[in-house]
Swiss-Prot record:
This is RNA-binding protein Hfq. Homohexamer. It comes from the Bacteria. The keyword Cell wall biogenesis/degradation does not apply. Gene3D superfamilies: 2.30.30.100. PANTHER family: RNA-BINDING PROTEIN HFQ. It comes from Rhodopseudomonas palustris (strain TIE-1). The gene is hfq.
């Protein structure tokens, strides 16, 4: 079924910022601010790299992810799922 193969928004977003090496600001649920680029991710965590150091960040600890530059995930002609 096509819905089974479709990527979810989270994976689409993270894969895009990983491939384009877009700098991110990530806020954790405890208020801590992290910055860097995503080098890897899976269902539970992501690897954030900055100044040659990597941090493993668990997704359940993330509150907000803000890209450092505008991104376009979908073609402008596509309908939004909402």
């Amino acid at each position: 079924m096509a819905a089974d193969r479709a990527q979810n928004l989270q994976d689409t977003f993270l894969n895009h910022v990983r491939k384009t090496k877009t700098p991110l600001t990530i806020f954790l649920v405890n208020g801590v601010k992290l910055q860097g680029i995503v080098t890897w991710f899976d269902n539970f965590c992501l690897l954030l790299r900055r100044d040659g150091h990597s941090q493993l960040v668990y997704k359940h600890a993330i509150s907000t992810i803000m890209p450092g530059a505008p991104i376009q995930l979908f073609e402008s002609g596509e309908d939004s799922p909402a």
